[in-house]
């Protein structure tokens, strides 16, 4: 069964254990393992959160259980899954979870507060970790298919590791500008081109030195002291004022900063 703090993905990957457990189980629902020694909280309008019901998949829950092959114990809950048969190093065929059709799945999150009335909580009731992880299947008889990203763990602090489009730090909000910038300039042609990747925090963004065609070295970054638009230079007589860069008219993107020379 799904253990304390164990993700459904880790549960599904242990095919050998699941197959051994399946030998001692009986099945009253097609494609679903049933066992009197497995208990989970079931909520409806007539029961409390402390009441328990035996089994893996309630009979009133539509749809197949997620399982790792014929005759194996399914992951608690219901959902759609495509099984794929692969061969290991000993050329023994085994079934493994392959492609999830997330548009036809309902989910429960590992947080009992998010389970609505009448739904099957597939998570351990004592799990109070910082991660709300999608577990395929909520077991809700009234559930409607909707899209989720299977196995996408999202922190409760809303931090993620997705790459984002580069934004001007002057216009980006502090919670969204969670980026680390790496910029490469090819300035040997009339128009400059950049390759940008963002990830991290502004405070950790280093400056990168780039030698131009005139052998002048510029440093680019966010943490430097002076912010000067790329098509301007700092007035030597008045450091607080900027003047147009007469040597480089081709660069017209003010979000690309020349910070010091």
From Swiss-Prot:
Main location class: mitochondrion
Cellular component GO terms, alphabetical: mitochondrion
Ranges for region Disordered: 22-63, 121-148, 157-176, 242-261
Domain of life: Eukaryota
Record's keyword terms, sorted: Mitochondrion
Biased composition (Basic and acidic residues): 36-53, 250-261
Record's compositionally biased regions (Polar residues): 157-175
Compartment(s) of residence: Mitochondrion
Coiled coil: none
Protein name: Uncharacterized protein YNL195C
């Amino acid at each position: 069964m799904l253990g304390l703090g164990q993700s459904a993905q880790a549960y599904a990957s242990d095919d050998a254990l699941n197959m051994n457990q399946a030998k001692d189980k009986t099945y009253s629902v097609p494609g679903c393992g049933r066992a009197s020694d497995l208990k989970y909280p079931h909520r409806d309008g007539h029961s409390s959160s402390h009441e328990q019901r035996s089994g893996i998949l309630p009979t009133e829950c539509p749809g197949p259980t997620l399982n790792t092959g014929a005759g194996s114990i399914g992951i608690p809950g219901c959902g759609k899954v495509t099984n794929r048969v692969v061969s290991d190093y000993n050329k023994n065929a085994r079934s493994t979870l392959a492609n999830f059709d997330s548009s036809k799945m309902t989910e429960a999150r590992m947080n009992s507060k998010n389970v609505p009335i009448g739904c099957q909580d597939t998570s351990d009731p004592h799990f109070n970790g910082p991660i709300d992880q999608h577990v395929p299947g909520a077991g809700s008889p009234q559930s409607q298919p909707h899209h989720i990203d299977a196995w996408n763990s999202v922190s409760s602090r809303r931090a993620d590791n997705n790459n984002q489009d580069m934004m001007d730090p002057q216009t980006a909000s502090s919670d969204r500008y969670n980026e680390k910038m790496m910029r490469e300039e090819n300035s040997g042609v009339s128009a400059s081109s950049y390759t940008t990747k963002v990830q991290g925090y502004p405070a950790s963004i280093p400056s990168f030195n780039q030698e131009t065609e005139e052998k002048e070295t510029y440093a680019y970054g966010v943490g430097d002291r002076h912010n000067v638009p790329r098509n301007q230079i700092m007035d030597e007589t008045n450091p607080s004022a900027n003047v147009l860069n007469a040597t480089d008219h081709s660069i017209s993107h003010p979000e690309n900063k020349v910070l010091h020379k």
